[in-house]
Amino acid sequence: MVNVALLLDQIIATPLRSMVEAQQESANATVEFLTSLIDENGKPKGIELAYEQTVFDPERGL
C-alpha cells in the first residue's frame, strides 16, 4: 500500500505544488512590474509616444 500512496503523491501533489509555485512567481513578477511604474514620489511614471499612421480610403483609392 505504501507504493500506491507514493505514486499518488507523485501524480497529484507534485504537479499541484509546481503550479502553486509558478503562480507565486507570476504574482511576484506582476508586483515588481507594477512597482517599477511608480517614481520615488509615489506618482505613476509617464511616457510620451508619437507615431504616424497612413489611412487609406478604399472608396477613393488613397
Swiss-Prot record:
What is the superkingdom listed in this entry's lineage? Archaea
Signal peptide start and end residues: 1-22
Its source organism is Archaeoglobus fulgidus (strain ATCC 49558 / DSM 4304 / JCM 9628 / NBRC 100126 / VC-16)
What are the entry keywords? Answer: Signal
Specify the protein name.
Answer: Uncharacterized protein AF_0416
